[in-house]
């Protein structure tokens, strides 16, 4: 069911535009707004680093990581998302893409990474009590976990339902997500062995939309 849900989502999510406002063909975007917010510097990695994205989708952020000289590994549950990533980036950068559930991939993975990240990805849609320990095990000493997602709705914390619409004749597909306020995220990360955890809500850019972006960073 979940694989079907994310394949359905893939058909609704447009491919990343060819260039950003600065004319760049690859870039890193933590937020739901184009040309807004910090970039890959949050990861603290560079040439020769090994970086994993959990829930890599169509690979736009991961491709930018690869252009910075890092080994870029991505895992996603959706075959449709990975096909789109391969079609877009195969002739441009080298990505190591794996079709799997993030928990399953991490359980069998023997590599370690300098950074693991998720942008509206697997960290949002996986129980942190199960996911965070497996990420912690695969991070090198001092390695970084960073992730972004929408902030929680006031009073709606923990496991929540998200709906992915289908045709008018079909019920939406349901996936679970985990929402917490910034102080609770830092507490959860510390409980699972992470250090120097920070969490903040980046404000939306000027304009009619007001919802910001939750950005969380912690070190192993």
Where are the model-predicted features located?
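Conserved class I S-adenosyl-L-methionine
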Residues: 1-47, 60, 144-176
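Class I SAM-dependent methyltransferase SAM/SAH-binding core
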Residues: 50-52, 58-104
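A short acidic, Gly/Pro-enriched loop at the edge of an enzyme's catalytic core
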Residues: 107-116
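A short glycine-rich, Lys/Arg-flanked "PGG" loop and its adjoining helix->strand segment in the class I
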Residues: 129-144
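Short alpha-helix
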Residues: 176-193
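Conserved S-adenosyl-L-methionine
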Residues: 194-205
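C-terminal lobe and adjacent flexible extensions of AdoMet/dcAdoMet transferase-like proteins
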Residues: 214-220
